[in-house]
Amino acid sequence: MHVPVLLEELILALEINPKGFYVDLTLGRGGHSLAILEKISNGKLVVFDKDQDALDQTRPKLLAYKQNIEIIWSDFSRFDFYLENLGIQFVDGFIIDLGVSSPQIDDPERGFSYSKDGNLDMRMDKSQKLSAFIVLNEYPYEKLVEIFFKYGQIPYAREIARAIINSRPLKTTFELVNLVKKVIPALVLVKKNFIKNVFQAVRIEVNNELDSLQKLLEKLPKFLKQGSKVAIITFHSLEDRIVKKAFLDLIRKDKLEFFQKGLPKFSMKVFRPKANELKSNPRAKSAKLRLLLKNR
C-alpha cells in the first residue's frame, strides 16, 4: 500500500480554495490528489503521470470526482502545453512528489528495487525505449562513470563501471546488486549503502529525471498569480538542490522591489516529516517539502 508522504503538511500549506485550480504533476496512487479533491467543491484539479500503470490503477478512485478532474498521461516537463490547450492561465497550487511510489518499488518486474530480483527496467514510462538494461549493457565506460559520479555521488564509480563492462550482459537487478557487492568493500557498504546510489543513478538516467525537473521549474512561474503556491517533495540531495536553487533565484531576483515595497514577491518554507509519520512510514525519512509562495 502506498502512503502519501507529508500529506498533512502539504494540505495545510496549500490553504486550499474550494473554488481554486490545482495541478498535481505526479499523480502516483492519488494520495495527495484525493485529499485535494475532498476540499474543492467548485474547483478543478488537473493530474499528470508518465506511468500508465499508475493512471490505470488510480483512475477508479477518482471517478467520484470526475466533474472536478482532468487526467493526463505525460511527463511533467510538458505540463505547460496541456494547460495552455485547456485554456488555463493561472494555477492556485502545484503539487510535485518526486519519489518513486511504493507499488513501483514493490513490483520486481519494474526493476526499481535492489531488494527484489527482477528485470533491469526502471522505466517510469514503459512505452519509452531506454531502460536500465540498455544503460548497463550498451553505454560506454566513460558514460557509466559520469552517471555514477553525477547522479549517484559514488566514489567507486570507475570500479563499478569497469566491472559492468567486464560482466556484460547483465539481465537482473540482483546481478547488478551482486556486482556492486564484489566491487565495494563490505565494511564500506555497512557504513553507506552505495547499492542504493547505483540504482538511483541508473534510474535518473533512464527517466531523464533531473533535466525534466529543471524544465518544469523554468516553466512554473508564468502560471503563478498572487497567492499561488508550489509544493515540491524531494527525496535526495540532487533534486532538492535543484528545487532550492530555482526557488531562491526567484526570491533573489526581486530584491530591489522588496526594499521598495516591503513585501517579497516570492518566499519559501521547508517542512520535514514528523516523528509519528516516520514511525508509520520509514520511507518518508529522506523526504523534504519545499513550498514556494507568490505573495504579490
Swiss-Prot record:
Belongs to the methyltransferase superfamily. RsmH family. It catalyses: cytidine(1402) in 16S rRNA + S-adenosyl-L-methionine = N(4)-methylcytidine(1402) in 16S rRNA + S-adenosyl-L-homocysteine + H(+). Keywords: Cytoplasm, Methyltransferase, rRNA processing, S-adenosyl-L-methionine, Transferase. S-adenosyl-L-methionine binds at G30, G31, H32, D49, F76, D97, Q104. Gene3D superfamilies: Putative methyltransferase TM0872, insert domain, Vaccinia Virus protein VP39. NCBIfam families: 16S rRNA (cytosine(1402)-N(4))-methyltransferase RsmH. One of its GO terms (biological process) is rRNA base methylation. It holds the Pfam family Methyltransf_5. It is found in: Cytoplasm. Its EC number is 2.1.1.199. This is Ribosomal RNA small subunit methyltransferase H. GO terms for molecular function: rRNA (cytosine-N4-)-methyltransferase activity. It comes from the Bacteria. Specifically methylates the N4 position of cytidine in position 1402 (C1402) of 16S rRNA. Transmembrane segments: none annotated. It is an enzyme of class 2 (transferase). GO terms for cellular component: cytoplasm. Its main location: cytoplasm. The lineage of its organism: Bacteria, Bacillati, Mycoplasmatota, Mycoplasmoidales, Metamycoplasmataceae.
